[in-house]
């Protein structure tokens, strides 16, 4: 009986304490408001899926002449061919419409169809993509002085190395009405694609109308074309932004808060594009900020332009040691026979691989300064129509299988 009484007293005490607790939770009210419903917590957002890794290998050390995945790799110290193009023409009917820009576009551009044919041809002829930064590297000589050296590449047996570079991948304003893509975006699968408008004004997202996503797609279909994960080096200016995004400032007009807000929004929009390009084997080089002439412009203007490239472009794409001469114009008139003040300045700013344009894939390691100079070949309208095309480009393709004479204006050809 005493045990039962004690148990009842304990239960009464528990209920009493519970009532006190409830009263404290309701700011002194002794009765609970049972009509109020508790709001459930917001569900945690699902994390963004991490992009799958993209394997990028160093051809100078992997696999050092051994085998990987059943493929034998052998040392290669021969010529490394280098081709460059400008943005490709997606809609020839807009480019070749008889206006004042038609001849220039025919001279210096290729169509998306021609570009696809070139990729197929160099692939069939045994070329594989390599990163320009893997071909030459900086080291020190026996005296401790910095020097550039040509690296031995280890390639799949029977293959030949090919560097690709794409100039002016900025998608300038004039291009938007002349049949080019407008900009790069990430498509619904997170892959690099182009965005633009067709001749009827319809918005088009595609991986078949611009050189960059087209190469991505080609490598997906032919992974042995890029055994080390390399794609191409994008040679960018900055005076009309980069990759189709207007990230530039403009000192020639009064810069307003609205302009700066738009610029900042473009900067934020292009960052994931840059990140995905770099993740998937693309690299960046300078084409100067204003596409300037390095052979004739004053040192003061060259210095100002270079700093602006670092501030507005390099700050987004990251550091680079590659410079592509606009117009192919060499600093100080001749960067091979002389090492003049402009070349010395550019080298002092970190550029070690400096590329012009020529009739062969020429390269020369400078003896008096830590730098290498290169010439690149240029598939475009001038060379596709040239009488020298077989002599200079025959190792890459048969021009008769490349040029799209049905799409181009009738300017004739100089080969049989």
Which functions belong to the PLM regions below?
Residues 16-19:
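C-terminal motif of bacterial Sec signal peptides marking the signal peptidase cleavage site
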Residues 129, 135-146:
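Membrane/wall-proximal cationic-aromatic binding patches
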Residues 24-70:
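N-terminal, intrinsically disordered, polar/charged segments of Gram-positive cell-envelope systems
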Residues 83-95, 144, 148, 155-162, ...:
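Metal-dependent polysaccharide deacetylase catalytic core of the NodB/CE4 family, i.e.
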Residues 51-132, 148-164, 173-176, 283, ...:
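C-terminal active-site subregion of NodB/CE4 polysaccharide deacetylases
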Residues 2-10:
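Sec-dependent signal peptide recognition
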């Amino acid at each position: 009986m005493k045990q039962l009484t004690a148990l009842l007293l304990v239960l009464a005490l528990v209920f009493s304490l519970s009532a006190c607790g409830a009263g404290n939770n309701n700011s002194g009210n002794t009765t609970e408001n049972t009509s109020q419903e508790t709001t459930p917590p917001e569900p945690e957002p699902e994390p963004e899926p991490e992009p799958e890794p993209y394997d990028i290998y160093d051809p100078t050390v992997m696999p050092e002449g051994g085998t990987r995945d059943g493929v034998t790799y052998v040392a290669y110290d021969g010529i490394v061919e280098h081709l460059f193009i400008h943005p490709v023409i997606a809609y020839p009917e807009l480019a070749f419409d008889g206006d004042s820009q038609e001849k220039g576009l025919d001279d210096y551009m290729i169509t998306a169809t021609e570009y696809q044919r070139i990729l197929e041809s160099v692939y069939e002829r045994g070329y594989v993509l390599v990163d320009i930064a893997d071909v030459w590297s900086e080291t020190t000589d026996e005296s401790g002085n910095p020097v550039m050296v040509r690296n031995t590449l280890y390639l799949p047996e029977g293959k030949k190395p090919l560097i690709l570079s794409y100039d002016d991948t900025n998608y300038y304003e004039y291009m938007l009405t002349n049949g080019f893509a407008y900009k790069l975006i990430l498509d619904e699968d997170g892959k690099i694609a182009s965005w633009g408008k067709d001749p009827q004004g319809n918005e088009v997202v595609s991986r078949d109308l611009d050189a960059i996503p087209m190469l991505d797609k080609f490598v997906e279909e032919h992974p042995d074309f890029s055994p080390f994960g390399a794609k191409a080096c994008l040679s960018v200016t900055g005076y009309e932004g980069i990759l189709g995004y207007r990230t530039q400032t403009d000192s020639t007009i009064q810069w307003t808060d609205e302009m700066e807000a738009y610029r900042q929004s473009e900067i934020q929009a292009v960052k994931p594009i840059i990140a995905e390009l770099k993740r998937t084997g693309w690299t960046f080089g300078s084409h100067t900020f204003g596409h300037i002439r390095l052979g004739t412009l004053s040192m003061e203007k060259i210095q100002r332009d270079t700093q602006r490239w670092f501030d507005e472009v390099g700050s987004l794409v990251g550091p680079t040691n590659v410079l592509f001469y606009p117009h192919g114009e060499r600093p100080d008139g001749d960067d091979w026979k002389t090492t003049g003040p402009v070349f010395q300045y550019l080298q002092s700013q970190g550029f070690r691989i400096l590329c012009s344009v020529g009739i062969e894939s020429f390269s020369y390691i400078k003896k008096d300064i830590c730098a290498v100079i290169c010439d690149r070949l240029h598939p475009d309208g001038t060379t596709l129509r040239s009488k020298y095309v077989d002599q200079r480009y025959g190792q890459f393709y048969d021009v008769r299988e490349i040029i799209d004479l049905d799409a181009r204006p009738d300017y004739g050809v100089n080969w049989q």
